[in-house]
Amino acid sequence: MKAIETEYKDILFRSRLEARWAILFDALELEWVYEPDCFILSNNQKYTPDFYIPKYDLYIEV
């Protein structure tokens, strides 16, 4: 099944699921950043976590 891009708060999310998580973070009054960083893994692949929650210094992949 192909992900459906979804816009929320002027951000185009790659999927509806990611947008729903953003809505949940807002409901919980958690500051969040969407796809803030890109990391290079040991096998030289790029990895971009979906969210960063600054309050907890936490990256989240949904």
What are the language-model segments listed below?
Residues 1-35:
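Acidic-basic catalytic patches of nuclease active cores, encompassing PD-(D/E)XK
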Residues 28-43, 50:
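A short acidic/basic microdomain associated with nuclease active sites
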Residues 33-34, 59-61:
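A structural signal for short, well-ordered beta-strand segments and their strand-loop junctions
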Residues 44-60:
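Active-site beta-strand-loop-beta-strand hairpin of nuclease catalytic cores
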